[in-house]
A protein has these predicted regions:
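Membrane-interface helix termini and inter-helical loops of multi-pass transporters
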Residues: 20-33, 85-88, 134-146, 192-197
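Hydrophobic/small/kink-forming positions within alpha-helical transmembrane segments
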Residues: 14-17, 21, 49, 70-78, ...
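Alpha-helical transmembrane segments of compact multi-pass small-molecule transporters, enriched
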Residues: 43, 47, 95-109, 183-187
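Specific transmembrane alpha-helical segments of multi-pass solute transporters/efflux pumps
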Residues: 18, 55-91, 132
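C-terminal transmembrane-helix exit sites in multi-pass transporters
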Residues: 52-55, 82, 99-121
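Structural motif at transmembrane-helix junctions in multi-pass transporters
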Residues: 28-35, 79-95, 171-175
Length: 197
């Protein structure tokens, strides 16, 4: 029996859990928001573009699905990276992890999936959990911060990305995986001058 799956799972969880550390380091030296997204995902796009070009014949019939993956996944990544760099990490991650709520609702509204009593119960428990964790009574008297809104947008974008990924079933896995990198870089290219960064 091989331990490779367990090692990969633990390694991925550790990398995901500690991914905010370099973001805070970059923020401490003044590289934050869309310029950071442009730098990181611009570099990753250098690897993504050749793969996307090589697989273009396979994804061309579902190019709109791949575009949705790039926009939704790229937007989610850009929003999450910025929120983690400027906000409270725990709060940002809690708001981001409402993504399954948006995913269930999106599956119901966009893909016609059934909302079973079990799913409705899970949605209600998730909303109650976030309300208790974030102290909803104070949230009603204090508006959400910019990083809070970015975290919510990231969760919503991630859910829409997952729905688009499921719908674009003929797009090769490598293209589905790499398109959000290019999407993040392009979103940052547009938003850097708009935001004056």
């Amino acid at each position: 029996m091989t331990l490779l799956p367990q090692i990969l799972l633990v390694t991925g969880a550790v990398a995901w859990g500690l991914g905010w550390l370099p973001l805070h380091h970059f923020a401490s030296v003044g590289l934050v928001g869309m310029p950071l997204v442009l730098l990181v995902y611009g570099l990753l796009s250098l690897f993504a573009i050749p793969v996307l070009w090589f697989e273009r014949r396979a994804w061309m019939p579902q190019r709109n699905g791949l575009l949705a993956i790039a926009v939704c996944g790229g937007g989610a990544t850009a929003a999450l990276v910025t929120a983690l760099a400027i906000g409270e990490v725990v709060r940002v991650m809690l708001l981001f992890y409402l993504a399954p709520v948006w995913g269930v609702l999106g599956g119901w509204l966009l893909l016609g999936e059934r909302l079973t009593p079990l799913r409705i119960g899970a949605l209600l428990l998730a909303m109650l959990g976030i309300a208790l964790t974030l102290n909803i009574s104070s949230a009603l008297t204090h508006p959400l911060s910019g990083s809070d809104w970015l975290a919510l947008a990231a969760g919503l974008g991630f859910s829409l990305n997952n729905l688009a990924t499921r719908a674009a079933d003929q797009v090769p896995l490598a293209s589905k995986t790499l398109a959000p990198f290019l999407g993040s870089a392009l979103i940052a290219v547009v938003l850097c001058p708009v935001l004056g960064e």
